[in-house]
Amino acid sequence: MSDSGTDLSTATSDDGVRRGEQFRDDLRCAPGRVLPAEVLGELTSLSTSRSVIAVSRTLLVILAVVIATTLVVTGSVAASQWSWLWVIIPAIFIVATQQHALFVLAHEAAHYRLFPNRRVNDLIGRLLAASVGLSMCSYRVVHRLHHNHLYGDQDPDIALHGGYPRGKAYLVRKLVADVFGLTAWKTYRYFLGSPTANVNTGVAQRPLDDTLPALRQAARNDRWLVAGVQLGLPVCIVMLFGWEGFAMYVLLWIVPAITVLQAILRVRAICEHGAPSGYDSAMQAARTTIVGPVLRFALFPHHVNYHIEHHLYPAVPQYNLARLHAELTQRGILSAAEVRSFGATWRRVFAPPAMS
């Protein structure tokens, strides 16, 4: 175990860097400017009850929206009315925000931070991810490269958040493509760990090759779970609720996942890393976004807006990130860091492209 509680593999690469399960604490900001061991011990402590509440709350919101919308739609259709169209649009948006929340919880599981018991952590994390078509085990491998090589040649996330500011027109085009479902296939390739090429160097990236054999096999096996869930769920819905139920499943689950969810993922990724003030450490290359309750619900569920803190100490579970932010702020560690409001971030992102 590392000091922060993150599991380390025993295998090392040729340059001595550990591989496999490790998510390194990014403390390049200033040597020695770290939290006391006793404080860090409290912050990295896992709570089963708090994770159960987080998972349950997200699932209950989804269930409530789906049931309420289904009742309105079926009632309106039976009465030959079209008023249900005004209910579908906000329902799709709300479901997409909660699909995003499920992903954030699967992200916690990828970091081994959802539940103290490893088997429970991985089982719940895999199921949450599979429900929206993602592989938690594949993402675990891919995401480790993002943490350990932030804005480096091996960072697989640069294609999504790199290169900003690019001007307003560029991002508007991207978001329109997201909302029309034109980019979903790229998202699912990424979360399944598919080979890709670095957008800057053109060098092929095969994230599942850069890990331990056991984790590589787990990632490949997890794809079968994802396929099983994605094929089995609609079959079960048809058997239980008929083709009307299947139509609602497509409308309230598939449509949000391939449209609005894609835009949410892009916006959050850009808030976290777009148009940074520097690239030398997570203090500048990552960003903490200060938001109110509306944006927290829409874009930053489960404290995911505290992104600098997450990069500095990835072993801290989501429900302790606000306290971690307070501890770092009190010690002056975030005084020169990328901590901005949502509006300030988007003024940077929407700035004209930098001249070469």
Language-model segments: residues:
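Non-catalytic, topology-defining segments of multipass membrane proteins
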Residues: M1-A96, S131-L251, Q318-S356
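Active-site-flanking alpha-helical
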Residues: V65, A110, L114-F115, D280, ...
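Transmembrane alpha-helical segments that form the membrane-embedded catalytic/substrate-channel core
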Residues: I94-A106, S135-Y139, T183-T187, W253-S281
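Histidine-centered catalytic micro-motifs
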Residues: A101-H111, Y139-Y151, R268-A275, F300-V316
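Aspartate-rich (DDxxD/NDxxD/DxxxD) Mg2+/diphosphate-binding motifs
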Residues: V104-I124, Y151-G162
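Membrane-cytosol interface motif
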Residues: R118-L128, Y279-G292
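Alpha-helical membrane-protein architecture signal
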Residues: V120, I124, K168, V172, ...
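Cytosolic juxtamembrane regulatory segments of multi-pass membrane proteins
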Residues: L127, D210-P213, A286-H303
